[in-house]
């Protein structure tokens, strides 16, 4: 059938819609500078950081962003857009990774730790990381929001023209201008103990660097300092605070018995520090020699040599807090902590890289560097002579020296602990542990099994022995795992949250390991002639709230406690229990002096009657008449005479201590220098192998 003729449309033509206005292609260069400012702001707000330093990290972010923004301008529009999306995703991944590291491990990690991270097994932290991912999902979405919007909308709203060449020059100039403006603000007259200018010239205090300078600048400075280490800015005003006359400053140590004549000569060695300073190979060695030469040594006392010739077993207990000790649930820990030396003001502050640098304090008597390289690992990499470590001191005295850890080679311990002087055994190098069908460690390893599978190495030795255990059962996360299972009925009856119940089970496992150890020593007839030393490496920082339940106290808001924000928490969260015990002790010895992990090595060296030089350690013999001091990672500190808050720059005298304002100002100024010196000396000792200059390895 023929269709009827249809006439063409004779009505009004409808004009097509005008093209959507698009932004010039060169405006894409603004994205990365603004993204970095956004990411820094989200990171700071999420971490509860002070925003007063926003101008600094905003300017440095704009500078770095302008430089990266060149990748958005130099090529064709499609390549520019894809490169920008890729860089946006990578930068966001970097920020979220650092955010999660701070949330779970209480530390930001610079790029120089990548080698360590690659060598470690993140499976140890997988449960905590997955939990943190889930708990912070809304924040992670906020981090990634700009990248998602860019990927979806950039092509739609940008022209397809090639950006003019002069736009690249504009952003390159912007990078320089913003960087110079950032430096100007950094060197403005900021107040405080750690100013932006001081942090900018330093490779330590990473958390403060992130807060004041920004994450991007911390990472940039880290890369710079890998090739150009910062020069020391320490002065040589080595005056020490005067000897206190206040109660408690001498330690308030109650003697076991009165000794008619006590040798109170200084614990020093016959070394020529002045001569070393004069002939030093560099400024750092000269500074160290002069500093140690000016330091007042601690004196021998009525406890010197109390355990001379004893076997020595030292334990660093993973994630341990004395708030968990209970006479019924942990009877062995209770017995040892109440029947030996009883330390009422002992602290285990959380320093950089937690366990590794908890060991640094305990084994070296030195505060760890608050940054990279990781101190304990570095000693193994360099082969630094740890002359005063118990392993070396007792090894020179003819002891059998062994060390054990129920894990893989984390933080390079096979090298570092062998270098300390231990015959080191861990999984894969001589220590047998339960494994899975695939041959991996049945995680976590049981502390009781580590004791059971190692004790025969030394228990029947004809020579004295020194054994070091780094335990593992208390490793986070605190969930119903193979460590908790044997104690499940007991802990589920406790009036705590499930996390706290599970944490208690890990402490019970450490308690049973100690019980087994004492039983083995007693059966071998070695118990009365053995000194037991035990401390935590750090508190359970991933779940510090459990300590509020166990102690019945409040240490800060939930957010501040979760982040261990030292500007807002009660430092008693770090209060802990130090065990120094022998079955030969007739009665306990109460010690009220302020002390911490670095004090263990000199205290034990004196108790064993070893020859050591007390000037060359950051710790002090707790049982001597020296003033007690505990330094926290933020550089706040507590001494026998009071507490100094670095954030408020205020000093609160201890109970019973009276000072005029002038005396207080002089004391605080002097102590702040001592704190700086004790923190700064460690990397110089390690990097220059300082002890080896005085005591060359044979």
Where would I find each of the regions flagged by the language model?
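Transmembrane and membrane-interface helices of multi-pass
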Residues: 2-268
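Alpha-helical scaffold segments in carbohydrate-active enzymes
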Residues: 92, 196-200, 271-274, 513, ...
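Helix-hairpin-helix/helix-loop-helix acidic hairpins
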Residues: 235, 257-294
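Solvent-exposed soluble domains appended to multi-pass membrane proteins
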Residues: 278-698
């Amino acid at each position: 059938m023929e269709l009827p003729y249809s006439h063409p449309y004779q009505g009004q033509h409808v004009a097509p819609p005008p093209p959507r206005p698009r932004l010039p292609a060169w405006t894409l260069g603004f994205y990365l500078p603004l993204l970095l400012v956004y990411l820094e702001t989200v990171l700071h707000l999420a971490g509860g950081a002070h925003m007063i330093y926003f101008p600094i990290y905003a300017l440095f972010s704009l500078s770095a962003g302008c430089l990266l923004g060149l990748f958005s301008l130099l090529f064709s529009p499609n390549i520019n857009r894809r490169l920008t999306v890729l860089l946006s995703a990578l930068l966001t991944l970097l920020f979220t990774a650092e955010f999660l590291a701070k949330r779970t491990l209480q530390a930001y990690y610079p790029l120089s730790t990548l080698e360590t991270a690659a060598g470690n097994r993140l499976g140890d932290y997988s449960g905590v990381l997955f939990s943190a991912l889930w708990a912070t999902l809304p924040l992670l979405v906020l981090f990634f929001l700009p990248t998602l919007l860019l990927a979806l909308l950039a092509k739609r709203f940008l022209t397809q023209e090639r950006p003019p060449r002069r736009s690249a020059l504009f952003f390159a100039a912007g990078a320089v201008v913003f960087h110079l403006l950032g430096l100007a603000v950094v060197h403005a007259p900021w107040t405080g103990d750690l100013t932006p200018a001081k942090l900018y010239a330093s490779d330590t205090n990473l958390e403060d660097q992130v807060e004041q300078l920004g994450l991007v600048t911390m990472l940039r400075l880290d890369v710079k300092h890998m090739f150009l280490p910062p020069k020391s800015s320490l002065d040589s005003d080595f005056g020490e605070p005067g000897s206190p006359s206040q109660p408690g400053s001498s330690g308030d140590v109650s003697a076991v018995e009165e000794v008619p004549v006590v040798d109170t000569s200084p614990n020093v060695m016959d070394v020529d520090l002045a001569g070393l300073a004069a002939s030093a190979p560099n400024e750092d060695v000269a500074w160290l020699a002069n500093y140690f030469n000016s330091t007042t040594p601690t004196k021998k006392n009525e406890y010197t040599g109390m355990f001379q010739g004893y076997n020595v077993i030292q334990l660093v207990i993973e994630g341990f807090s004395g708030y968990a000790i209970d006479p019924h649930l942990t009877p062995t820990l209770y017995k040892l902590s109440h029947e030996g030396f009883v330390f009422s003001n002992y602290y285990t502050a959380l320093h950089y890289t937690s366990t590794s640098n908890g060991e640094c304090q305990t084994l070296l008597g030195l505060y760890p560097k608050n940054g990279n390289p990781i101190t304990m690992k570095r000693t193994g990499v360099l082969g630094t002579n740890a002359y005063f470590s118990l392993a070396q001191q007792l090894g020179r005295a003819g002891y059998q020296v062994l060390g054990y850890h129920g894990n893989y080679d984390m933080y390079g311990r096979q090298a570092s602990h062998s270098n300390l002087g231990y015959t080191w055994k861990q999984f894969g190098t001589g220590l047998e542990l339960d494994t899975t069908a695939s041959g991996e460690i049945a995680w976590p390893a049981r502390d009781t099994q580590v004791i059971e599978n190692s004790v025969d190495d030394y228990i029947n030795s004809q020579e004295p022995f020194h054994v070091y255990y780094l335990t593992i059962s208390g490793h986070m996360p605190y969930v119903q795992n193979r460590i908790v299972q044997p104690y499940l009925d007991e802990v589920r009856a406790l009036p705590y949250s499930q996390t706290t119940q599970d944490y208690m089970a890990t402490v019970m496992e450490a308690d049973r390991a100690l019980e087994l150890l004492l039983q083995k020593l007693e059966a071998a007839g070695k118990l009365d002639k053995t000194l037991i030393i035990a401390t935590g490496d750090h508190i359970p920082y991933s779940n510090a709230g459990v300590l509020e339940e166990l102690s019945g106290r409040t240490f800060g808001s939930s957010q501040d406690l979760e982040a261990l924000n030292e500007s807002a928490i009660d430092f008693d969260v770090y209060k802990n229990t130090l065990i120094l015990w022998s079955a030969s002790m007739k009665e306990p010895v109460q010690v009220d002096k302020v002390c911490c992990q670095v004090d263990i090595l000199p205290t034990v060296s004196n108790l064993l009657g070893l020859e050591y030089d007390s000037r060359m350690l950051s710790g002090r013999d707790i049982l001597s008449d020296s003033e007690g001091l505990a330094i926290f990672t933020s550089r706040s500190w507590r001494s026998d005479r009071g507490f100094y808050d670095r954030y408020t720059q205020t000093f609160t005298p201890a109970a019973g201590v009276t000072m005029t304002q002038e005396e207080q100002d002089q004391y605080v100024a002097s102590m702040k220098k001592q704190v700086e010196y004790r923190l700064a000396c460690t990397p110089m000792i390690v990097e220059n192998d300082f002890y080896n200059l005085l005591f060359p390895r044979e």
